[in-house]
Swiss-Prot record:
This is Elongation factor 4. It is found in: Cell inner membrane. GO terms for molecular function: GTP binding; GTPase activity; guanosine tetraphosphate binding; ribosome binding; translation elongation factor activity. One of its GO terms (biological process) is positive regulation of translation. Belongs to the TRAFAC class translation factor GTPase superfamily. Classic translation factor GTPase family. LepA subfamily. It catalyses: GTP + H2O = GDP + phosphate + H(+). It comes from Shewanella woodyi (strain ATCC 51908 / MS32).
Length: 596
């Protein structure tokens, strides 16, 4: 046991976590040079293309240290994006220490802080590593001071390395052995294993990544999942060296996988505890908290025949992604689909992309909404995540919107722009601290404003230097109303949105004009209106296409032309009473892109 080290790598986006893990694997001979691909652990196509890590992955390596001993290193590569912070907390629950990787050119960013605090809250040892020292703009001294100043951990003698060129990788490994404590646990005691992650393999069933806290799990053991009480046989156990390698047993302190031929998707929920079926542990391990979705959107398959396969795809995905929440929903405009809860807009994009790629579905998404707390006049409190579930205006006593506390780190040159943005988004400033060249500002902002496009706007006003992390604090009373779009007097439920009272004129007008561009002209006039309750606040008409019926008249009396024009008018009127308007797919997406 004293030769095992479990650690994860935490860092901000693009500070080089995945490249560093590649180097560690190479240094310890986990893969031959031929098998090395850049970003070995980013196994999904989307991860490679966007250059971000989404899923945590684990690897077991053997390292012969300078003291002559061989150590088993289990490390977990974690995502750095704010939407995936629950992945990070999950990986940390399985470790004793973390490497905090900081780009020696960029310095500390908000996400570095957020993940680092998560680690410190769990009483873990955080070891700073300065990466990218080969860059001309690298300034390790300044960054070391920044780490001590902003994060508050010793960094004067932090290891300096360059994952790209391989300088200092040996030192990183030595620091891991020296500074990260070995796991504690009772080998003789009853088995307790924490499920860090699970995914569905169409041949093997559910594959679970586990960290053994106490006891030993042998191949062929009967074990039970503590939350469901189901028992299974461990058909195969083993480790990833990144390749899947079978072993005879997993001992206390080790991280590895278990395959038990579990076929139902929720057989081994993430964060659960495994123990032996006979003489098992009494109580489960305290893992990590379940995350609540922050943003909801309706997602519908473009062809209704895909509904069943869409449901299967969601089931399989939710096994791998503990934070996904979904329930069936119907819409008069879009048919059958699901209301899905996401952690943020990036998460929503990724899930939609994974569904479209991995399961070949064509999907359409409605505008994302956050959860509102509503006090009805009858005194009941309800939570609404869908604009069409909103009670009538006269039944609402008070509407409360979720407020998040946002911590933003920004270089002081861009401070003005960022403050202007926060004010425009109805933010309230709580705190501002200068750290050298960086400024840390804390704002309370409505979550609805943050999830829509705040992240992109923040990046563009600060030329990409600002970084943010946010967490929910409370519900606060607000003047929110539902904006409906009516087409020829009929409400289109998929276009409704909940917005602040001060924005209804501008938003309503923008939306109506956008619809006017996107809905194709018909043979009759179409009225597009934006309404709040029964009050119409904006309108525009899409003019009818008409045939020139008087073209064949040559000379003759004017009453002849009038007759033809009146006949055409009658026809249009009749057509309007029976015609219905097809709203194209782009129109639904326009709601998302209103601010462009």
């Amino acid at each position: 046991m004293k030769h095992i080290r479990n650690f994860s790598i935490i860092a901000h986006i693009d500070h080089g976590k995945s490249t560093l893990s590649d180097r560690l694997i190479q240094e310890c001979g986990g893969l031959s040079d031929r098998e090395m691909a850049a970003q070995v652990l980013d196994s999904m196509d989307i991860e490679r293309e966007r250059g971000i890590t989404i899923k945590a992955q684990s690897v077991t390596l053997d390292y012969k240290a300078l003291d002559g001993e061989t150590y088993q290193l289990n490390f977990i590569d974690t995502p750095g994006h704010v939407d995936f912070s629950y992945e990070v907390s999950r990986s940390l629950a399985a470790c004793e220490g973390a490497l905090l990787v900081v780009d020696a050119g960029q310095g500390v960013e908000a996400q570095t802080l957020a993940n680092c605090y998560t680690a410190l809250e769990m009483d873990m040892d955080v070891v700073p590593v300065l990466n990218k020292i080969d860059l001309p703009q690298a300034d390790p001294e300044r960054v070391a001071d920044e780490i001590e100043d902003i994060v508050g951990i010793e960094a004067a003698d932090a290891v300096r390395c360059s994952a790209k060129t391989g300088i200092g990788i040996k030192d990183v490994l030595e620091v891991i052995v020296a500074q990260i404590p070995p796991p504690e646990g009772d080998t003789e005691g009853p088995l307790q294993a924490l499920i860090i992650d699970s995914w569905f393999d169409s041949y093997l069933g559910v594959v679970s990544l586990v960290r053994i806290k106490n006891g030993i799990l042998k191949k062929g053991d009967k074990f039970k999942v503590m939350s469901t009480g189901q028992t299974y046989n461990a058909d195969r156990v083993g480790i990833f060296t990144p390749k899947q390698t079978d072993t005879a047993e997993l001992k206390t302190g080790e991280v590895g996988f278990v395959i038990a031929g579990i076929k139902e998707i929720h057989g081994a929920p993430v964060g659960d505890t495994l123990t032996h079926a006979k003489h098992g542990a009494e109580k489960p391990l305290g893992g990590f908290k379940k995350v609540k979705p922050q943003v909801y959107a309706g997602v519908f398959p473009i062809s209704t025949d895909d509904y069943e396969s869409f449901r299967d795809a969601l089931n399989k995905l939710s096994l791998n992604d503990a934070s996904l929440f979904f329930e069936p929903e119907t819409s008069s405009a879009l048919g059958f689909g699901f209301r899905i809860g996401f952690l943020g807009l990036l998460h929503m994009e990724i899930i939609q992309e994974r569904l479209e790629r991995e399961y070949n579905l064509d999907l359409i998404t409605t505008a994302p909404t956050v959860v509102y707390e509503i006090v009805k006049t009858s005194g009941d409190t309800i939570y609404v995540d869908n604009p069409s579930d909103l009670p009538a205006i006269n039944n609402i006593a008070e509407m409360r919107e979720p407020i998040v506390e946002t911590n933003i780190l920004v270089p002081k040159d861009y401070l003005g722009n960022v403050i202007t943005l926060c004010v425009e988004k109805r933010g309230v400033q709580k705190n501002m601290v200068y750290h050298g060249n960086q400024v840390a500002i804390t704002y309370e902002l409505p979550m609805a404003e943050v999830v829509m496009d705040f992240f992109d706007r923040l990046k563009s006003t600060s030329r990409g230097y600002a970084s943010l992390e946010y967490n929910f604090v409370r519900f606060e009373p607000a003047d929110m109303v539902r904006l409906d779009i009516l087409i020829n007097g009929d409400r289109v439920d998929a276009l409704a949105m909940i917005i602040h009272k001060g924005l209804i004129r501008t938003k309503g007008l923008a939306l109506v004009n956008k619809m006017k561009e996107l809905i194709p002209r018909q043979m009759f006039d179409i009225a597009v209106q934006a309404a709040v309750g029964s009050q119409i606040i904006a309108r525009s008409s899409i003019k009818a296409m008409r045939k020139d019926v008087t073209a064949k008249c040559y000379g003759g009396d004017v009453s002849r032309k009038k007759k033809l024009l009146n006949k055409q008018k009658e026809g249009k009127k009749r057509m309007k009473s029976v015609g219905n308007v097809e709203v194209p797919q782009e129109a639904f997406l326009a709601v998302l892109k209103l601010n462009d």
